From Swiss-Prot:
Gene3D superfamilies noted in UniProt: 3.30.530.20, Homeodomain-like (1.10.10.60)
Protein name from the UniProt record: Homeobox-leucine zipper protein TF1
Family stated for the protein in its record: Belongs to the HD-ZIP homeobox family. Class IV subfamily.
Record's subcellular location: Nucleus
Cystine pairings recorded for this chain: none
Length: 709
């Protein structure tokens, strides 16, 4: 073996062979035919050393030779090779020769390094793919199990079948007995006599509960009562829950619930409606990390960027310890939003309690503490998450969202979707599954070697901020920072709002948000696929302006192929001298709601974020982006007649379009009328272009335009 040149440190000639040694003292080297051959390690060392001039062939100082330690590549050599590998994984002979001269390594060392690196990347990708398939298998098994249970224990309240009624009665009796036993255990552990009515009653004593907020014992007892009620709701397979066909979530059987937990439901008397759903999903994250995201207000908001617009801890009754959040009780105020101007945001104050039931089994409980003198539009009944560890770095999460809410401000277009989709349990677990899968993909997936892990993290955080800004601008949340100028938010009455800002260029002092919600007679799946289609992008996207759009790189993948963070570039024909426009896009698909949000980003800023070794600053200290995008929701009312088909595959779509642009305010913080008029005209034209593109693509299915009767 002939080396290209000698090095300053002779032992570096062995670096290329380090990964090729077998446990039997032999080394494996690929020959020109990519076939493996085995050579005794000692003879191989002697041959290489003699050939490179480091030691004579017949040297008698074999003991000294044996004691020599192999040295790894220096940091600079590794940096050069890693950097070139991120650009080209298969260098030609000329590139290998140049790398050899740059790093001081031999040609064979460079060759073997790239071979080993390719094998390493391929192995890591295979392991990651195998892990994702195993998680998907667990999800399908759990779904199959729940479908079988629902099929075998189906309950019809309008049926006169005595066996079904007997089954419901037996289940109610079991639940009542379990609830009574749990209450007695709580009373025994607290050293207090059991109460006369052991059922959990939140609504019957709101004044009493709020007046005792500062009573530690009372707070702890209320939290434990809610915990046991949540466990019963999470583990019950019959009677209490009705599966929704094709929706992957369940709704509460209110009649059975009232029998299990009797008490006056005074909330309904003052106009509150009950929304109660349950959903299960696999999360690619260990259960302790999930608890950390749920218990910390900042992490809680960033983990659900399109769901939570604000979260704050009002008071901590039991502080966390070095062991974690076990036993922590805290009072939180959370503002939840849905990306549509026709659905008002919800602000709810509740008690959050974390308890470790067993090793690998944790429950996080939410229950409201409402003062009777303060009108609240959202009150939480026992809700929360049951988190069960399945295997290392993955767990099963059962979410229950049970609230009493005043939805008088919800538009009739979204009224059928309120109990289950808009603020339901399915949306919580879908977001958890998506975020955890993306976080894992950022660190473990090596399919985009041209972007470093640090750069992928930066772009991932920027994509989350982009989604949060888009949803917040549409819902006009954020403590009243948005001022609505005109419009209700429908197709015929486009809403325009603005907020002051100090970000971005000094020539602009405000951000203008334009949004509208409308119904499309196409399934959500077809609408989502059309919007993501890069070939048709130039037909409706004013940001592209007829350019050719191509995908540059995928930063992170979530649960499926429709859930990605990507960098796109668009190039206009005949304008090569102007370079390319970069677009950061964040999109996800789920039956509980889909989205596609994107923003133009400067290519120099993109390179800085990808190559910079530092993290993005927290909060709003990062680059200023102005999101444009779509929020999609399946029309539940139109899909009711197609039972058994997955939600979103049939029926219509409730689509919300929105974009934000920087503007300059007039004196007195007033909006220029021409700015609002131009924004409304731009939104109207975009809606027309999207409808036209949909009509042209699906005219063969509908025969005529689906947008006209």
């Amino acid at each position: 073996m002939e080396m290209n040149q000698q090095h300053n440190e002779g032992n570096e000639s062995f670096v290329a062979l380090m990964n090729g040694f077998a446990g039997d003292g032999t080394a494996t080297l690929p020959n020109d035919g990519e076939q493996r051959m085995s050579i005794p390690a000692r003879e191989l060392f002697a041959a290489i050393e003699a050939d490179s001039g480091l030691l004579p062939v017949n040297s008698s100082n074999t003991n000294e030779k044996r004691k020599r330690r192999l040295q790894r590549l220096t940091g600079k050599q590794s940096e050069v090779l890693e950097g070139f590998f991120s650009i080209c994984g298969h260098p030609d002979d000329g590139q290998k020769r140049h790398l050899s001269e740059t790093t001081g390594l031999g040609l064979d060392q460079v060759k073997f390094w790239f071979q080993n690196k390719r094998t390493q990347v391929k192995t890591m990708c295979w392991k990651e793919e195998n892990y994702k398939l195993s998680v998907e298998n667990e999800i399908l098994r759990d779904e199959n199990r729940r479908v079988k249970i629902a099929h075998c224990t189906a309950v019809c309240l309008t049926c006169c079948n005595s066996s079904v009624q007997n089954q419901l009665a037996v289940e109610m009796e079991r639940l009542m007995g379990q609830s009574e036993w749990l209450q007695q255990e709580i009373a025994r552990s607290n050293g207090t006599p059991p109460a006369a009515n052991l059922a959990f009653q939140l609504n019957s004593s709101a004044d009493y509960v709020f007046s005792g907020q500062h009573d530690q014992q009372m707070i702890a007892e209320l939290a434990k009562n809610a915990m046991h009620a949540l466990i019963i709701l999470a583990e019950s397979h019959v009677a209490l829950w009705f599966p929704v066909p094709g929706c992957s979530y369940e709704v509460l059987n209110k009649m059975a619930y009232d029998q299990a937990y009797p008490g006056d439901n005074s909330a309904n008397a003052i106009g509150f409606k009950t929304e109660a759903t349950r959903a299960v999903s696999m999360v690619m994250m260990d259960y302790k990390s999930v608890v950390d995201f749920l218990m910390d207000p900042y992490n809680y908001r960033t983990f659900f960027p399109e769901v939570i617009s604000g979260a704050v801890t009002n008071r901590i009754y039991t502080w966390p310890t070095s062991d974690g959040y076990n036993g922590v009780i805290q009072l939180m105020t959370v503002e939840m939003m849905f990306p549509s101007p026709l659905v008002p945001a919800r602000k709810c104050t509740f008690l959050r309690y974390c308890n470790v039931l067993n090793e690998g089994l944790v429950v996080v409980i939410d229950v409201s503490l409402d003062d009777g003198s303060i009108f609240s539009k959202c009150r939480k009944m026992p809700s929360g998450f049951l988190i069960q560890s399945i295997r290392p770095n993955s767990c099963k999460v059962t979410a229950i969202e049970h609230v009493l809410a005043d939805d008088t401000g919800v538009h009739e277009l979204y009224q059928p979707c309120m109990n289950g989709l808009v603020f339901g349990a399915r949306r919580w677990v879908a977001t958890m599954a998506r975020q955890s899968a993306r976080m894992r993909d950022v660190h473990h997936n090596k399919t985009a070697p041209q972007v470093s892990t640090k750069g992928r993290k930066n772009l991932m955080k920027l994509a989350d901020d982009l989604l949060a800004s888009f949803a917040g601008g549409i819902a006009a949340t954020g403590g009243g920072t948005w001022t609505v100028v005109i419009g209700a938010g429908t197709e015929k009455d486009i809403r325009v709002a603005y907020r002051r800002t100090t970000e971005g260029s000094s020539s602009y002092n405000a951000i203008l948000s334009v949004t509208a919600s409308l119904r499309l007679p196409l399934p959500m799946r077809k609408t989502f696929d059309l919007l993501r289609n890069l070939t048709h992008r130039c037909k409706w996207d004013v940001l592209v302006h007829g350019s050719v759009v191509k995908e540059e790189v995928t930063i992170a993948r979530g649960v499926g192929n429709d859930d990605t963070v990507t960098v796109l570039h668009c190039k206009r024909a005949g304008r090569e001298d102007r370079g390319r426009t970069m677009i950061l896009q964040n999109n996800g698909y789920d039956a509980s709601g889909s989205f596609m949000v994107y923003s133009q980003i400067d290519s120099e800023l993109m390179n800085t974020m990808v190559l910079s070794p530092s993290d993005l600053p927290p909060g709003r200290g990062g680059p200023s982006l102005y999101p444009t995008g779509f929020s999609l929701l399946p029309d539940v009312e139109a899909a009711q007649d197609s039972s058994g088909i997955a939600l979103g595959e049939v029926g219509g779509t409730l689509m919300t379009m929105g974009f934000q642009i920087p503007v300059k305010l007039a004196s007195g913080d007033r909006m220029y009328s021409r700015s609002a008029a131009s924004a409304i005209r731009l939104m109207t034209d975009t809606i027309a272009l999207v409808k036209k593109t949909l009509m042209n693509e699906h005219s063969g299915i509908y025969g005529v335009s689906p947008f006209h009767p």
